[in-house]
Amino acid sequence: MKIKKLTSYLLGRNYEAQAKLFLQKQGLSFIAANVKVHGGEIDLIMKDKQTWVFIEVRFRKSGQYGDALATITRSKRKKLLHAAAVWLFQRGECFETSSCRFDICAITGQQFEWLQNAFNQNEFTR
């Protein structure tokens, strides 16, 4: 792995760890991190009481070219939804029978933003 990629990887893991600690302080229970399934990766999976919470963590050094939240495109949301559906299916669950939400932890410079229920599976159904 090249140094720049390694540095980006470690930086990403650092911010994911910070997000995990923050969310635990808010009362969420940690389940898993960096879950890879066919078609995607979920940064953090946590539980908020009986609700599965799938979390995407994004970081930008500055907001000069848009904040971290702006990097979560429709395509990225669709991949996260698919990855969560696969993860649930592997456990005998699905969106229709489980309480789920998709949160975003966006870090731009020193600013930390937690968006609960930032999007959901209904965005892609007609």
Curated annotation (Swiss-Prot):
Q: Which organism is it from?
A: Photorhabdus laumondii subsp. laumondii (strain DSM 15139 / CIP 105565 / TT01)
Q: Identify the Pfam families for this entry.
A: UPF0102 (PF02021)
Entry-linked SUPFAM superfamilies: Restriction endonuclease-like
A GO molecular function held by the record: nucleic acid binding
Which regions form coiled coils? none
In terms of superkingdom, the source organism counts as Bacteria
Similarity annotation: Belongs to the UPF0102 family.
Name recorded for this polypeptide: UPF0102 protein plu4003
**InterPro entries found in the cross-reference section:** Restrct_endonuc-II-like, tRNA_endonuc-like_dom_sf, UPF0102_YraN-like
